[in-house]
Amino acid sequence: MTPKEIVLGGYKSFAEGDMEGLGKIFHKDAYIKINGDHELSGTYRGFDDFLNNCLAKLPAKLPNLEADILNTIAEGNRVCVHIHWTADNLDMYSIHMFVVEDGLETEFHIFDDSQKMAEALSG
């Protein structure tokens, strides 16, 4: 699979609620960084850290969260995804940047509209 196919497969797993499948595409020591200064901002090491300390909180914090992928650009082992996120309390655009090595995501940088995200998380 290409890096782009791996990344897009991850969004499919996320949309289906398949966290086990999503976790399989992350390197065990993956570096995950969420920009901003809100409760989910920061650095996560490995998928389990990301799952337990970020993803597991999303259903309660962002009810009915959905991602609409607008565009995907891949060059070499880097993939960038432009996304429109909606939830009951959120309408936001973001960019996700991935590094894929040997079939696994080793880096995942989340560039959200952190002001909108902070407002949604605090509400």
Describe each model-derived feature in a short phrase.
Residues 95-119:
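Short beta-strand edge/turn micro-motifs at domain boundaries
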Residues 6, 18-33:
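Short, well-ordered alpha-helical segments enriched in acidic and aromatic residues
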Residues 81-88:
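Short beta-strand segments that buttress and anchor functional surface loops
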Residues 27-72:
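A solvent-exposed, acidic/Ser-Thr-rich amphipathic alpha-helical stretch
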Residues 66-67, 90-96:
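Short, surface-exposed coil-to-beta transition loops
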Residues 25-26, 74-78, 98-105:
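Short, solvent-exposed coil/turn segments at beta-strand boundaries
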